[in-house]
Amino acid sequence: AVDGRQIFIEPWGNTALIGTTDDDTYADLDDLPVTTDEVRYLVEGVEQVVPRVREARIVGTTVGARPTLYKYGPTEDALSREHEIVDHAKDGARGLYSLLGGKLASYRMFAQEAADLIAPKLGNHAPCTTHSSPLPGGDRPADIDLLAARFELSRFAVERLVTRHGSRAETILADSGRRGRMVVCSHEPVLACEVRWAAKHEYARTLLDVARRTNLAMGACGGNDCALAGAVIAGEELGWSPGEVRAQAAELLRSRQRSRLPAIGDKQARAEAMTMAALRTLGR
């Protein structure tokens, strides 16, 4: 990057992820902002090695809060990514523990350390098996070509399904008929049976939940081609009324629009908002 920090470019399905930035935040964790300056910072950094990067279209931005261990003075990127378990017995609160810091790459080790500390205090002295237990769908490899032929799907569609669900992809497909194998979002792609699976087995209760589990609307279409279709399918499983189906689709579209606004800049974002307001007025 322009200030010497590292930037990563990672392939992700039909797109590439570019990141990351670090900044202190005091915002609502349910509504964290992405700034235009952060987008420009990343694009300028990548431009040094990919000169034509500005010709690519930014389809969205993503943000999250990382609970790094606090230390006064260092810049955000210099803060430790280590984790720590605090026993609050010393504060007079026996049985209360805080898990601080850490990151996604070490979450299972962090969980094992917490279990090894707390379980014996509850009378459970069995050894922790987290380190040897496969994640859901990670018990065995899936044969993509065999699944594509068996269920009459494109290899790409099956490959993306396996990427998201591993060996569970076969179960998801086997539970569906031909209608269930319909492609809902062609940019990812996401199948109808995958939307149903998220609602039935993965505790999805909103269309945004479905999107987070399947990548519905997260690609180039931004939900324009698939939000309503996805809402109809999820609604059949979750018992939504027609009005709730429309409301869920609208909320997903609003979410995807918010993720794109930092990429087009503040002034253009305001112009887009004015255009949308004018269109709504004309449509009345």
Sequence positions of predicted segments:
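Low-complexity, small/polar and acidic-rich linker and loop segments
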Residues: 240-284
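C-terminal catalytic lobe of FAD-dependent flavoproteins
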Residues: 1-19, 23-222, 234-235
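Alpha-helical interaction/regulatory segments in DNA maintenance proteins
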Residues: 222-240
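Small/polar glycine-rich anion-binding or flexible loop at a beta-alpha turn
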Residues: 212-217, 227-229, 250-251
